[in-house]
């Protein structure tokens, strides 16, 4: 019996992926692999629009709450975890469904990754200690000496990427920009992918949804959620978790850098920019089935398309 292709349900923020996912789960014995770099974090539920407890009870969900906000999770980690999950889910006679909007994760899974050295905890701690004393701009200047191409595209305060680029240089003896031209390892050849892409027919309609969604998060307690994170001494604005859209704006508000209204407007604007980047990536993918996420019956349309590829 042939294994059905992997359905990838992709789309920008506020496109309605969650509702479509649940509709699919009512029809097939699915398990969801979340393709989302924010919902991996524990204690970050409201601002990430994480599936509710009731939704998680309806269908098995993977790659939720797998990291503390102080911890890193890379595209390479996602690829490793997802390939193992796909094998396990299929071995149990169930169907994996990839759903989410972190396009780098889709790219890593399908196209593979470059052979970069793994992070070294000792070296990472040394770099963080130096940054605490010298500041990230000083480490950015050091990176510019090792790898001017990578340094030129990074902000002097982009701590995560500066740290990683310096790690690569110091561990491998080569510039990250040079290593990124190396050979990639694509997904196993027996995996086939079908992308169902939820895309808006009208940009203004998506923007309205984004504003409504962000306001709903504020009403649900996003400020309190960020305040709780901010009370931790091991979290700071340079971490990927805190830089998530919505969180960094509320963090700035709680730091007194902006007013509440400014944080709201900046959060909505940042979400729109995220959606724009997501759509730009999707539109560059030639093989995708497009569903208008603003039309009535979007979830039913997704089910109809999936039925072309899934058994039963």
Curated annotation (Swiss-Prot):
Family annotation (Pfam families): IPPT
Top enzyme class: transferase
Positions marked as site (Interaction with substrate tRNA): 102, 124
Region: Interaction with substrate tRNA, residue numbers: 36-39, 160-164, 243-248
Family in the record: Belongs to the IPP transferase family.
Protein name (record): tRNA dimethylallyltransferase
The reaction(s) this protein catalyses: adenosine(37) in tRNA + dimethylallyl diphosphate = N(6)-dimethylallyladenosine(37) in tRNA + diphosphate
InterPro entries: Dimethylallyltransferase, IPT, P-loop_NTPase
NCBIfam families to which the protein is assigned, alphabetical: miaA
PANTHER family: TRNA DIMETHYLALLYLTRANSFERASE
HAMAP family documented for this protein: IPP_trans
N-terminal signal peptide: none
Function description: Catalyzes the transfer of a dimethylallyl group onto the adenine at position 37 in tRNAs that read codons beginning with uridine, leading to the formation of N6-(dimethylallyl)adenosine (i(6)A).
Transmembrane helix keyword on record: no
UniProt cross-references to SUPFAM superfamilies, sorted A to Z: P-loop containing nucleoside triphosphate hydrolases (SSF52540)
Keyword entries, A-Z: ATP-binding, Magnesium, Nucleotide-binding, Transferase, tRNA processing
Domain of life: Bacteria
EC number: 2.5.1.75
Binding residue positions for ATP: 11-18
GO terms of biological process kind: tRNA modification
Residues binding substrate, per UniProt: 13-18
Subunit description: Monomer.
GO MF annotation, one: tRNA dimethylallyltransferase activity
Listed cofactors: Mg(2+)
């Amino acid at each position: 019996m042939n294994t059905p292709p992997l359905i990838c349900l992709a789309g920008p923020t506020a496109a309605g992926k969650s509702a479509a996912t649940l509709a699919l789960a009512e029809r097939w014995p699915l398990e969801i692999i979340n393709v989302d770099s924010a919902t991996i974090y524990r204690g970050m539920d409201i601002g990430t629009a994480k599936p509710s407890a009731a939704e998680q009870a309806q269908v098995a969900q993977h790659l939720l709450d797998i990291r503390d906000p102080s911890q890193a999770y890379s595209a390479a980690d996602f690829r490793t975890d997802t390939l193992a999950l796909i094998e396990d889910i299929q071995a149990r006679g169930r169907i994996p469904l990839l759903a989410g909007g972190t396009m780098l994760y889709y790219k890593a899974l399908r196209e593979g990754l470059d052979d970069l050295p793994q992070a070294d905890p000792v070296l990472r701690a040394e770099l963080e200690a130096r940054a605490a004393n010298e500041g990230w701009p000083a480490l950015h200047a050091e990176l510019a000496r090792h790898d001017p191409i990578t340094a030129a595209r990074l902000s002097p305060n982009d701590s995560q990427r500066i740290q990683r680029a310096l790690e690569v240089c110091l561990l491998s003896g080569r510039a990250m920009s040079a290593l990124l031209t190396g050979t990639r390892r694509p997904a196993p050849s027996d995996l086939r992918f079908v992308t169902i892409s939820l895309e808006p027919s009208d940009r203004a309609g998506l923007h309205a949804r984004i504003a409504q969604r962000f306001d709903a998060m504020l009403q649900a307690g996003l400020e309190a959620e960020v305040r709780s994170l901010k009370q931790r001494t091991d979290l700071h604005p340079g971490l990927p978790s805190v830089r998530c859209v919505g969180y960094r704006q509320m963090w700035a508000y709680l730091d007194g850098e902006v007013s509440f209204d400014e944080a709201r407007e900046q959060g909505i604007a940042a979400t729109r920019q995220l959606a724009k980047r997501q759509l730009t990536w999707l539109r560059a993918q030639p093989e995708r089935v497009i569903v208008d996420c603003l039309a009535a019956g979007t979830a039913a349309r997704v089910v109809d398309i999936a039925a072309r590829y899934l058994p039963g």
